[in-house]
Structures are given as C-alpha cells and as structure tokens.
C-alpha cells in the first residue's frame, strides 16, 4: 500500500496511509493561510490545486490565479515531488496535514518544530517498508 512518509534523508519518522492530503500553513510574516492539495502516487507527490487568501512576502500569487469565495485558486504544473522538502522552524509555526475532512498539526506525529531540526521531507512510500526516496525501486523487487 502506498502512503505518505515524513522524515529526513530517507529516515522515516512517521507514515500515514492516505491517498491524498492538503498541506496548509500560515505565511510567517503576513499570517495568510496557504493550502496545497497533493495526491500520493508511486512516482511521488502530485500537486493539484493551491489556494491562498492573499499574497505574502516572497510568495506571489500566479497571474492565472482565479478568485473564488475570498481565496485565490491556481494550479502549477510540476513533476512528481519525491521528496517534497519543507523548512520547519519554531519561528515560522507548524504545518498542518488535512485529510478525511480534518486538519492536524504535524506536531501530532513529529513533535513541535525545533531549531535543531529545521527541515522535513514528505514522500510517497510503500507503508511498512524501510525504503527511502533514494533507494526506492532497488532491492529484491
């Protein structure tokens, strides 16, 4: 079963059996909520729609974004992300993972953000497998 792994440098800190999720956060300066929808596929995380309530420093809304119900909606064409790299620090606040119509702070699985560990990676993985994004597809397969 393919699911979502969270960790760093191939070390798995948490696994979630979800086929899709929304990654949400508040811009560290503007305090504006951003959301990105992802599908979990064998080849990586596939970005779907993104939404934002307004622009923030260093994170401009694309020119083709459309305003619906107070949020800008847009899509970016990216190859599968394997892994998706995130900065995660106490100063910026935590990310949320939303699935099954509920949002959860990443600290539910990983503990609070720490200055000593300012990065996080998300990737699709075979649940219960020790394979990292680097060695995925190699081995006795």
Residue ranges of each PLM-predicted region?
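Mature, soluble, non-transmembrane domains
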Residues: 60-141
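Residue-level detection of beta-strand-connecting loop/turn positions
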Residues: 8-10, 101
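A short beta-strand micro-motif
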Residues: 2-8, 23
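N-terminal secretory signal peptides
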Residues: 11-62
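Compositionally biased, low-complexity repeat tracts
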Residues: 3, 54, 133-137
């Amino acid at each position: 079963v393919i699911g979502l792994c969270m960790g760093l440098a191939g070390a798995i800190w948490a696994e979630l059996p979800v086929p899709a999720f929304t990654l949400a956060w508040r811009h560290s300066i503007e305090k504006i909520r951003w959301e990105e929808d992802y599908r979990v596929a064998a080849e990586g995380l596939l970005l779907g729609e993104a939404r934002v309530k307004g622009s923030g420093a260093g994170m401009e809304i694309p020119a083709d974004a459309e305003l619906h119900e107070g949020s800008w909606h847009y899509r970016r064409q990216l190859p599968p992300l394997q892994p998706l790299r995130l900065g995660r620090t106490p100063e910026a606040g935590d990310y949320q993972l939303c699935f099954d119509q509920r949002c959860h702070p990443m600290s539910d699985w990983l503990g609070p953000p720490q200055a000593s560990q300012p990065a996080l990676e998300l990737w699709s993985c075979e649940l219960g497998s020790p394979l990292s994004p680097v060695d995925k597809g190699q081995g006795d397969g």
